[in-house]
């Protein structure tokens, strides 16, 4: 919105030309989202408390968590407010990538909000039924995956729908002008051709998988938000490089017109995340809830797909991956041993992984900070792939 105003004024007032720089608007988006979150935080927390949006705590978990019972949840709304307002102010609203990431973010946020609402207000411990949640996640994820398959290229955005129908009529065999190769990090000009269907399937798995992985990681005060900020910032750097023809050519990346604008979204997400951390740091005044975790995870996955860094996301988000794998291993092993031995056995003391370390004697703050440190190292490894090829 401000970009439109600045472009109208820049001929008369030269200062407004600075708004044409993505880096400037990314910084301002970060600061704006941060200030909005810090200012609105007390009001949001107070309203959540008045509405009795208190988090129920598992009785079979670490005993230290029992004191958290009743802490307001659904604080992810605070993050989404900051992202929305900041992007509306600083992003180029004609950019299709901004809108698809916003749609996925707020779509998953809506799913999370319904899940939280049923858990907290209706006192239903299961929240949204697994099949219902999976249906809506699949609907949003497939929509984004199919759209991106036809738009991550230099085609006119208005042709996306037309090309989609042509692809369907061809029996999913039409060769379309879309960049669907899987880029292999640390390798110079090496990629794996996925084809249109392969791209759609991979994109869907990355978007939905990332959303659920971040949600599983959200279990301790401040645990998930810092990795989200760090990974988001790194993806913003990739977006800036691949959205710039000169930098993309120099670093041997495919040029994706318009991708650089995602740096503004990543900045807004980082600023809103820092504001949330101000109130979520131990002892937390508010929890993120599914409304925030599902939304942020979906955003990371979508951005990674757009900039073709799915494998790098897997590396940088190693904490999210480890948490998810720990749950999968625990469930599968429990079912197998129950079938063969009559009682279920566990690999971990408790899943997700952060609870395993808690029950092993680590304090909550130790788990959180150590997971942050691991994420910093993984993000640095991911960023090194910009040059080490």
Curated annotation (Swiss-Prot):
Question: What's its membrane topology?
Answer: Multi-pass membrane protein
Q: Which gene is this protein's source?
A: mraY
EC class of this enzyme? transferase
Q: Which GO terms describe its cellular component?
A: plasma membrane
Would you identify the family this protein belongs to, as annotated?
Belongs to the glycosyltransferase 4 family. MraY subfamily.
* Originating organism: Polynucleobacter asymbioticus (strain DSM 18221 / CIP 109841 / QLW-P1DMWA-1) (Polynucleobacter necessarius subsp. asymbioticus)
Q: In which pathway does it act?
A: Cell wall biogenesis; peptidoglycan biosynthesis
PROSITE patterns cross-referenced by the UniProt entry: MRAY_1, MRAY_2
Q: Name one GO biological process term.
A: cell division
Its transmembrane ranges are 25-45, 73-93, 97-117, 135-155, 190-210, 222-242, 258-278, 286-306, 311-331, 366-386
| UniProt catalytic activity | UDP-N-acetyl-alpha-D-muramoyl-L-alanyl-gamma-D-glutamyl-meso-2,6-diaminopimeloyl-D-alanyl-D-alanine + di-trans,octa-cis-undecaprenyl phosphate = di-trans,octa-cis-undecaprenyl diphospho-N-acetyl-alpha-D-muramoyl-L-alanyl-D-glutamyl-meso-2,6-diaminopimeloyl-D-alanyl-D-alanine + UMP
Q: What role is this protein assigned?
A: Catalyzes the initial step of the lipid cycle reactions in the biosynthesis of the cell wall peptidoglycan: transfers peptidoglycan precursor phospho-MurNAc-pentapeptide from UDP-MurNAc-pentapeptide onto the lipid carrier undecaprenyl phosphate, yielding undecaprenyl-pyrophosphoryl-MurNAc-pentapeptide, known as lipid I.
> What is the protein name stated in its UniProt record?
Phospho-N-acetylmuramoyl-pentapeptide-transferase
Signal sequence extent = none
Report the EC code(s) recorded for this entry: 2.7.8.13
User: Pfam families, from UniProt?
Assistant: Glycos_transf_4 (PF00953), MraY_sig1 (PF10555)
The record's annotation in PANTHER family points to: PHOSPHO-N-ACETYLMURAMOYL-PENTAPEPTIDE-TRANSFERASE (PTHR22926), PHOSPHO-N-ACETYLMURAMOYL-PENTAPEPTIDE-TRANSFERASE HOMOLOG (PTHR22926:SF5)
Which keywords fit this entry according to its UniProt record? Answer: Cell cycle, Cell division, Cell inner membrane, Cell membrane, Cell shape, Cell wall biogenesis/degradation, Magnesium, Membrane, Metal-binding, Peptidoglycan synthesis, Transferase, Transmembrane, Transmembrane helix
GO molecular function annotation: metal ion binding; phospho-N-acetylmuramoyl-pentapeptide-transferase activity; UDP-N-acetylmuramoyl-L-alanyl-D-glutamyl-meso-2,6-diaminopimelyl-D-alanyl-D-alanine:undecaprenyl-phosphate transferase activity
Which InterPro entries does UniProt cross-reference here?
Answer: Glycosyl_transferase_4 (IPR000715), PNAcMuramoyl-5peptid_Trfase (IPR003524), PNAcMuramoyl-5peptid_Trfase_CS (IPR018480)
Answer yes or no on keyword Membrane: yes
Which prosthetic group or cofactor does it need? Mg(2+)
Top-level taxon: Bacteria
């Amino acid at each position: 919105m401000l970009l439109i105003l600045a472009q109208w004024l820049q001929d008369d007032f030269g200062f407004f030309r600075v708004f044409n720089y993505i880096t400037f608007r990314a910084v301002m988006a970060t600061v704006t989202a941060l200030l909005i979150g810090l200012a609105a935080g007390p009001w949001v927390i107070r309203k959540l408390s008045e509405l009795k949006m208190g988090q129920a705590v598992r009785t079979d978990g670490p005993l230290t968590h029992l004191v958290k019972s009743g802490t307001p949840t659904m604080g992810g709304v605070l993050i989404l407010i900051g992202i929305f307002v900041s992007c509306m102010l600083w992003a180029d609203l004609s950019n299709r990538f901004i809108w698809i990431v916003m749609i996925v973010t707020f779509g998953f946020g809506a799913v999370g909000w319904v899940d939280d609402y049923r858990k907290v207000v209706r006192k239903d411990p299961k929240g949204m039924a697994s099949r219902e949640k999976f249906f809506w996640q699949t609907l949003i994820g497939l929509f984004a995956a199919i759209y991106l398959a036809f738009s991550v290229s230099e085609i006119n955005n208005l042709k996306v729908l037309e090309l989609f129908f042509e692809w369907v009529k061809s029996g999913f065999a039409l060769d379309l002008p879309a960049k669907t190769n899987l880029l292999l990090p640390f390798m110079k000009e090496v990629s794996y051709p996925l084809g249109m269907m392969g791209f759609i399937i991979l994109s869907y798995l990355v978007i939905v998988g990332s959303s659920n992985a971040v949600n599983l990681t959200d279990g301790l005060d401040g645990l998930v938000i810092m990795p989200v900020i760090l990974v988001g910032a790194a993806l913003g750097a990739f977006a800036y490089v691949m959205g710039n023809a000169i930098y993309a050519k120099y670093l041997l990346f495919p040029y994706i017109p318009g991708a650089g604008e995602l740096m503004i979204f990543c900045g807004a997400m980082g600023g809103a995340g820092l504001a949330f951390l101000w109130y979520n740091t131990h002892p937390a005044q508010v929890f993120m809830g599914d409304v925030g975790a599902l939304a942020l995870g979906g955003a990371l996955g979508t951005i990674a797909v757009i900039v073709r860094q799915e494998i790098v996301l897997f590396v940088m988000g190693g904490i999210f991956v480890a948490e998810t794998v720990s749950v999968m291993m625990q469930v599968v092993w429990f079912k197998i041993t129950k079938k063969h031995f009559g009682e279920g056995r566990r690999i971990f003391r408790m899943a997700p992984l952060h609870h395993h370390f808690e029950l092993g004697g680590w304090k909550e703050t130790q788990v959180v900070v150590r997971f942050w440190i691991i994420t910093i190292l993984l993000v640095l490894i991911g960023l090194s792939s910009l040059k080490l090829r």
